[in-house]
């Protein structure tokens, strides 16, 4: 009988799940690839114990990605929630998005995003991606942009391009400033 290290079985399972996700995140950061064997070794569990929580490495990677995207959403929300001016909110969103990249946290999202996920999990990740961009859509609508979805995708493209530049080693401050200037110029043209 396995030892339960929490007040209830549900809490024990949640703690184990968190430990497995944390181990998978660490393995992914170190090697870019997650295997059940590597996660089992990292946690000190048997591979069969890992499979009690996750059917496959893809399911585990999906939880890593979902947790990291949720953290990114929280980071962005904290950056924009108290800003009333939609233009300044857009600037804060771009700045916060790229600070997340510059401090290295986005590398985990990129690595996990390259994995082949089960369709249900892929849909969950796509929903979270839409949540990431929700503040942009809201700000654009408040600015009177009638085709906010299209313009938001352009803003996302600018941020994605700056992300690749930062990850390639270009100075983050320069990329943030350029991305903000370019995005705002585009928004101004769309008004």
Language-model segment annotations:
Residues 63, 77-103, 155:
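Hydrophobic alpha-helical connector segments
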Residues 15-24, 39, 64-68, 72, ...:
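Generic hydrophobic, amphipathic alpha-helix propensity
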Residues 95-99, 146-168, 172-186:
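Hydrophobic alpha-helical segments that form the core
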Residues 70-73, 118-153:
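Amphipathic alpha-helical packing segments from all-alpha helical-bundle domains
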Residues 1-30, 36-42, 59:
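Basic, helix-initiating cap at the start of DNA-binding domains
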Residues 13, 17, 61-65, 69, ...:
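Amphipathic, non-transmembrane alpha-helical scaffold segments
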Residues 43-54:
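Short hydrophobic/aromatic patch on the recognition helix
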Residues 59, 98-134, 164, 168:
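Short secondary-structure transition hinges
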